[in-house]
Amino acid sequence: PLNTQQVTVGGVTYTAWDVSSVTNMGGMFAYARSFNQNLNSWDVSNVTDMTAMFDFTDVFNGNITSWDVSNVTSMLSMFYYALKFNQDIGDWDTSSVTNMLNMFGFTDDFNQDLSTWNTSNVTSMKRMFENAGSFNQPINTQQVTVGGVTYTAWDTSNVTDMSSMFNGSTNPTPFNQVIDKWNTSNVTKMPQLFAFTSAF
């Protein structure tokens, strides 16, 4: 287990797995095909880069629901090919994220409510749910209030690339939600946005 905890070794007491000063966790568990631990106790509040953090983790479905990701700017490929991941991360503060490219690409099981995510700074949603074989949750633009703060969830006004966002070329995606309020005025790339979706 990699839980943050107080330990005493050789008469010295310290906090094991204190990651509170870490800023970059890019690729930390990439290709760790058997890794499946609970990491919910980790203080990741200073992390800015989670690129490919759980990339190609075949069985990972550890609890990370309480993570403070408010400073993270890159979630590029964070769960790419994380085949079994399906934790409730709907309460994550994603307001600083600019890159969600491939974030849930090729996730077989992921199907959680992300309806209150703040995507106002995201510029790339390219392949975000490509071949995500289970995802079918409401992600329309709407006013929400979370923790006393009111904001626009799924604000896509800064997104420039939505290429293959729901493409289901090898694993037809079931996504079939209303997204009629999305602001696509700055999007310059939309090729294969809904290609091979099984229900849309």
Language-model-detected regions and their locations in the chain:
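Negatively charged
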Residues: 1-200
